[in-house]
Swiss-Prot record:
Protein name from the UniProt record: Ribosome-binding factor A
Single Gene Ontology BP annotation: maturation of SSU-rRNA
Taxonomic source organism: Pseudoalteromonas translucida (strain TAC 125)
Assembly mode: Monomer. Binds 30S ribosomal subunits, but not 50S ribosomal subunits or 70S ribosomes.
Annotated InterPro entries: KH_dom-like_a/b (IPR015946), RbfA (IPR000238), RbfA_dom_sf (IPR023799)
Acidic residues compositional bias, start-end: 126-143
Keywords: Cytoplasm, Ribosome biogenesis
Statement: the UniProt record of this protein carries the keyword Iron: no
Gene Ontology molecular function: ribosomal small subunit binding
Function (record text): One of several proteins that assist in the late maturation steps of the functional core of the 30S ribosomal subunit. Associates with free 30S ribosomal subunits (but not with 30S subunits that are part of 70S ribosomes or polysomes). Required for efficient processing of 16S rRNA. May interact with the 5'-terminal helix region of 16S rRNA.
UniProt subcellular location: Cytoplasm
Similarity remark: Belongs to the RbfA family.
Listed GO CC annotations: cytosol
Length: 166
């Protein structure tokens, strides 16, 4: 079996050429920083879904507006694409917003915040444990002090400190 099917090769070529067209040919102020993230082509090469991502915007409406602008300019983009790609059939183009990048960033931020909260919780737990072990050491030291009995080393062997024989 071949490594890549014809539809995959056509999709890659369309992705590359549309990215260049968007960068150099389309001058609409309503478009943000649009990039082509993926292209899916039907088996008969008559339809192509172009997934776009819009950078520098957190607003979902701005991304949808960019997709609408590109869908309005589909005829022009398709004619430019036809000049760049030699194909018997030029697919009908449909621009769709790709939310996977934004979802990935949102999930990554959630994971990062959970890790920060967990680390802060562990730091707080460790300081509580250190405080309790310091308190236990204080109790142990006070017990050692009460058990300590002074022995008079100056007295003679075999006699207690009160002078009685052992």
């Amino acid at each position: 079996m071949r490594e890549f099917s014809r539809t995959d090769r056509v999709a890659q070529q369309i992705q590359k050429e549309i990215a260049v067209i968007l960068q150099r040919e389309i001058k609409d102020p309503r478009l943000g920083m649009v990039t082509v993230s993926a292209v899916e082509v039907s088996r008969d090469l008559s339809y192509a879904k172009i997934f776009i991502t819009v950078f520098n915007t957190q607003d979902d409406n701005a991304a949808k507006q960019s997709a609408n602008v590109l869908n309005e300019a589909t005829g022009y983009i398709r004619s430019l694409l036809g000049k760049r790609i030699r194909a018997r059939i030029m697919p009908e183009l449909k621009f769709l917003v790709d939310n996977s990048l934004m979802e990935g960033m949102r999930i990554s931020n959630l994971v990062d915040s959970i890790i920060r909260e967990d680390n802060a919780k562990h730091v707080a737990d460790e300081t509580d444990v250190e405080d309790s072990t310091d308190h236990e050491d204080d109790v142990t030291n006070s017990e050692d002090e009460t058990k300590h009995v002074d022995i008079d080393t100056d007295s003679e062997e075999g006699t207690n400190t009160d002078g009685k024989a052992q």
